[in-house]
Amino acid sequence: MVSVDPLATERWRSIRRLTDRDSAYKVPWFVPGPENFEALQNTKILVIGAGGLGCELLKNLALSGFRTIEVIDMDTIDVSNLNRQFLFRESDVGKSKAEVAAAFVQQRVVGCQVTAHNCRIEDKGQEFYRKFSIIICGLDSIPARRWINGMLCDLVLEMADGKPDENTIIPMIDGGTEGFKGNARVIYPKFTACIDCTLDLYPPQVNFPLCTIAHTPRLPEHCIEYIKVVVWPEEKPFEGVSLDADDPIHVEWVLERASLRAEKYNIRGVDRRLTSGVLKRIIPAVASTNAVIAASCALEALKLATNIAKPIDNYLNFTQIHGAYTSVVSMMKDDNCLTCSGGRLPFEVSPSSTLESLIIRLSERFHLKHPTLATSTRKLYCISSFMPQFEQESKENLHTSMKDLVSDGEEILVSDEALSRALTLRIQLI
């Protein structure tokens, strides 16, 4: 029920002006009244990520009237976080981001219950995500976005006529920032464009938050970036000269140490080409960009929970390089998307092309890391410490022509840690 406590009523006066009054921007079924604020306070909402964007989101949601919030993040607090992730203090360094952020918000906003989960999003199953009415992502990783996107699509049930059941849809609000640019979008799984529908919007990631590369590296790029921004300044090699990404001796020094760090965390893929590419570009996090995008995401959550206004349709761009500028565009759903539309993807390959060339194409198109390819009768490529028996055959297959591996029309199953579900390709030898 809505609180009758005079102090609580005064605290939410501004929000009640939106929920208790009529509006020209309302959705057609909106009816002014106290029930809207009650619905807001009873909405269960999940925030994924408690970093720069996540801290802003938690603060905004709690101060907007949401009372049941959960936050999930696998990272711990690093000293580099303290300049912009304002829910953390120096004494919190080394502690769980999710747990510290949840405790801070609960202490400052009376009546707001924030539950922390210090784990990977992949550690939670369907029953966990199904209990939420809205999920907001404040992630710095494309694979993580794709995973939760696939999970929410899987939660949508079909009715007898094959159409998605609207009652099983959990809206996803996704926010992202990079330097002075950011975006926010609202996704209705299987109804509007999902993350994979617009995967071309995301270039290969080359900019990484320091907290990630220092504490929980997950990509080869994380290892290289760590050597660049942490190890080089500390060790001051070559008599303390500045790192020159065009100097092959400097690049080799970084490559050797990045390879050792990658080996420590069981990460593959550190090579000279990638090292050179990462060394030449880094964009710092900007607190004001996080604030703007988090505010936009929180506003969309407020609209979804109360129906006081229509959500954006459906992708907001923001930039503050030369003044502040925003625009909203409507992303179209891809009817051939393997995640939200289902089905099998026809994939043309040359009969004389090799399996290695196919893997490169798939990795670039779908942002894969270490894909495994298999037909219904055999594994074509699988490099895994859990299945060493396939390694030699996989290496031999890399240089084998596709016509010698599969027949025209045969299906290949592609799995990868970046995917929440396997891709099914119908090979067309042309």
From Swiss-Prot:
Keyword terms, alphabetized: ATP-binding, Cytoplasm, Developmental protein, Ligase, Nucleotide-binding, Nucleus, Ubl conjugation pathway
Gene Ontology molecular functions: ATP binding; NEDD8 activating enzyme activity
InterPro entries assigned to the protein according to its UniProt record, in alphabetical order: E2-binding (IPR014929), ThiF/MoeB/HesA (IPR045886), ThiF_NAD_FAD-bd (IPR000594), Ub_act_enz_dom_a_sf (IPR023318), Uba3_N (IPR030468), Ubiquitin-activating_enz (IPR035985), UBQ-activ_enz_E1_Cys_AS (IPR033127)
CDD domains: Uba3_RUB
Keyword Cytoplasm applies: yes
Coiled coil feature spans: none
Oligomer status and interactors: Heterodimer of uba-3 and ula-1. Interacts with NEDD8 and ubc-12.
Family: Belongs to the ubiquitin-activating E1 family. UBA3 subfamily.
Protein name: NEDD8-activating enzyme E1 catalytic subunit
Source organism per UniProt: Caenorhabditis elegans
This protein's encoding gene: rfl-1
